Amino acid sequence: MNYQAVIGLEVHVQLKTDTKIFCGCSTQFGASPNSQTCPVCLGMPGALPVLNRKVVEFAIKAGLATNCRIAPRSVFARKNYFYPDLPKGYQISQFELPICQNGHLDIEVEGETKRIGITRIHMEEDAGKLVHSDIPGLGSGSGVDLNRACTPLLEIVSEPDIRSADEAVAYLKKLHQIVVYLGICDGNMEEGSFRCDANVSVMPVGSTTFGTRTETKNVNSFRFVKQAIEYEIERQIELIEEGGKVVQETRLFNPDSGETRSMRGKEEAHDYRYFPDPDLVPLVISNDWVADVALSLPELPEARRNRYRSDLGLSDYDAEVLTATREMAEYFEACLAAGAPAKGAANWVMGEVTRSLNEAGTGIADCPVTPERLTALLQLIEKGTISGKIAKTVFDEMWTNDKAPEAIVEEKGLVQVSDTGAIEKIIDEIMAANMGQVEEFRGGKEKVFGFFVGQVMRASKGKANPAVVNELLLKKLKG
């Protein structure tokens, strides 16, 4: 029997706010354990939560960018469970009335476009973190670090529309790109800023009844998500075919073995005894507020890619690379604003700029060659002042100092030679010294042409205008 996977993803997005969702404590990562806490974080009796307005704004941004309906009224609820990293004994989340509902994202897998529904986006606080290691003054054991408690999260819940690990990864990558573009999340998966719970079940092909699902918790890389889902699909099919039954449970993924293992029985919503939080009034969001937030949204990657293709004539590949990050897209846009030709700017941003950034181990936001200076360099190429090859030498010089490209060209005597008389003289000398190759060319061996071009460029120290060289050389070789 053939089986079809049914996958739904719950993505936790840690918001890039300076302070926590219900108090004024810092959200900075990596601080000393329990150094960023207060009575609210610690769940002290009588401590009252106060909602961070920036968290609501970020949630609205996420909802608009994923085509959701923004609820005019939403409610916070207490999710009750006991765990050492949850000192209150409940987590403040949203249940029946989340802030965003009924959205979607379109993904592309193997050239096919597919729409993945988004059930809801809700705001919640994160829990603390258990630390299993040597604890100063206590020896080996387990401790609780509550710095992360009350850190603001969005939980983005997809519909069970995903049918393969590849579709899941495509959806996650698109969602990750959007939240980073919006500036609401740093996207650091290693630090847990963007992590995923994968709900997986299988059913016979053609069936409309979903199988029993398992939930694999807190997978924090695209590669691990793919491995975890593929393993779980294979495990469930094998179990069913051997006459067993899939148990609804929570599982953990082991990146070393590439396998999932049982963690605990899967809870249902009623197990958490949700009820409205009496310390937080319902959140009312006006249409004007939503409209103001909508005006602040950046142009999103998909819209930008479409514009680059239709308005600038760039290829699908170029548009994809240039919009990979908001910083790169904005650098490219700044080049265009300074007067750079679109295709030339695209080639240089994807080529020399990216190469130099990778070698320096830095991001484009810290690029020492500003868009304006790069544009000035490209304009020298367009005017024929320097060749593309010489431009790379000039660019390397620009990387190490703040001189204008014109000044570097002048100082180093790199102006391109377009004087036909000077170039003809070089060609004549090279042809006279290589009559054997001249005869080969005239005998039909056209590959020899490249040899002569190389000799001329070498003799001119790379300064000869390649277009002029090709034209004159071809004319002389043909006699």
Swiss-Prot record:
It is an enzyme of class 6 (ligase). It holds the Pfam family GatB_Yqey. It comes from the Bacteria. GO terms for molecular function: asparaginyl-tRNA synthase (glutamine-hydrolyzing) activity; ATP binding; glutaminyl-tRNA synthase (glutamine-hydrolyzing) activity. The keyword Calcium does not apply. Belongs to the GatB/GatE family. GatB subfamily. This is Aspartyl/glutamyl-tRNA(Asn/Gln) amidotransferase subunit B. It comes from Geobacter metallireducens (strain ATCC 53774 / DSM 7210 / GS-15). The gene is gatB.
